[in-house]
């Protein structure tokens, strides 16, 4: 049975942990507001680019941009995995790594068996996981979310598009967390390349393109890819902060329950010690009288 001193030490330790988790929850909440704002602000621009590309895709031949050309046989695959740099965010990284693993070993099992699956990992957790297990990690961006910048998204998009144009890969898939709400992030494995031909055609009046749809699409496609990757990174960052805030809130509540139980145990042990001392005093007094 633990002594009063042991229980006091545990209470002190739990209180210290509770203060840390509470502070981390507040920090995550502040970061979430900022990350959510950035993700929401990026959506309209990405949607408009997608709309324009949808309007153009029906007016040009796929030869206008090799990134529009579909390849039926996905025998060489590039997986872009977006995880977090740090832990203490619940099952955020575990779930997204599981999805990436399942995508590689189920959807692209033949390509993996032939050694034709490569990865680009944005975020320390995913990078460390797949590198240590012997996967072909083409590029890693550890600690990328410490200072999230558009240049990283552009570099990833340019690397992926260059490999696709050169025929080094037949499919580019991005695995990430899409931010829907604090309690409902969505795991996604989205095909980035080839660009899907079923992009939504712009509603309403048609656009007039100068100098030509083919010339514009050549400029528009790289911007679209850059924006898509950037948006995915922003979504993942917001989902990470939401997961961390939720995890730290749960940890704080668990610490509160643990403290309640420890205080009850402490009071019972203290009461038992006092009762024992009183019994010894009474027993000693009786012995003296006799």
Curated annotation (Swiss-Prot):
CDD domains: F1-ATPase_gamma. It is a peripheral membrane protein. It comes from the Bacteria. Its main location: membrane. One of its GO terms (molecular function) is proton-transporting ATP synthase activity, rotational mechanism. One of its GO terms (cellular component) is proton-transporting ATP synthase complex. GO terms for biological process: proton motive force-driven plasma membrane ATP synthesis. Pfam families: ATP-synt (PF00231). It is found in: Cell inner membrane. Keywords: ATP synthesis, Cell inner membrane, Cell membrane, CF(1), Hydrogen ion transport, Ion transport, Membrane, Transport. InterPro entries: ATP_synth_F1_ATPase_gsu, ATP_synth_F1_gsu, ATP_synth_F1_gsu_CS. F-type ATPases have 2 components, CF(1) - the catalytic core - and CF(0) - the membrane proton channel. CF(1) has five subunits: alpha(3), beta(3), gamma(1), delta(1), epsilon(1). CF(0) has three main subunits: a, b and c. Belongs to the ATPase gamma chain family. Produces ATP from ADP in the presence of a proton gradient across the membrane. The gamma chain is believed to be important in regulating ATPase activity and the flow of protons through the CF(0) complex. HAMAP family: ATP_synth_gamma_bact. This is ATP synthase gamma chain. It comes from Chlorobium luteolum (strain DSM 273 / BCRC 81028 / 2530) (Pelodictyon luteolum).
């Amino acid at each position: 049975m633990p002594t009063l001193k042991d229980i006091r030490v545990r209470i002190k330790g739990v209180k210290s942990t509770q203060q840390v988790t509470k502070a981390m929850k507040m920090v995550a909440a502040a970061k979430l507001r900022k990350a959510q704002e950035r993700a929401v602000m990026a959506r309209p621009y990405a949607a408009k680019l997608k709309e324009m590309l949808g309007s153009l895709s029906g007016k040009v031949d796929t030869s206008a941009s090799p990134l529009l050309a579909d390849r039926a046989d996905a025998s060489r695959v590039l997986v872009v995995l977006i995880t977090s740099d740090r832990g203490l965010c619940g099952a955020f990284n575990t779930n997204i790594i599981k999805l990436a693993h399942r995508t590689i070993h189920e959807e692209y099992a033949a390509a993996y068996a032939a050694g034709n699956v490569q990865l680009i990992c944005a975020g320390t957790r995913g990078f460390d996981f797949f590198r240590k297990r012997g996967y072909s990690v083409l590029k890693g961006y550890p600690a990328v979310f410490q200072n999230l910048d558009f240049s990283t998204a552009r570099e990833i998009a340019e690397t992926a598009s260059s490999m696709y144009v050169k025929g080094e890969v037949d499919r580019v898939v991005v695995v990430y967390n899409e931010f829907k709400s604090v309690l409902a992030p969505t795991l996604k494995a989205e095909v980035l390349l080839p660009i899907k031909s079923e992009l939504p055609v712009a509603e309403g009046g048609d656009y007039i393109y100068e100098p030509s749809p083919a010339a514009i699409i050549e400029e528009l496609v790289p911007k679209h890819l850059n924006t898509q990757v950037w948006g995915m990174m922003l979504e993942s960052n917001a989902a990470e902060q939401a997961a961390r805030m939720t995890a730290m809130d749960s940890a704080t509540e668990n610490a509160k329950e643990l403290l309640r139980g420890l205080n009850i145990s402490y009071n019972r042990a203290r009461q038992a010690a006092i009762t024992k001392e009183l019994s010894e005093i009474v027993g000693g007094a009786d012995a003296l009288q006799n």
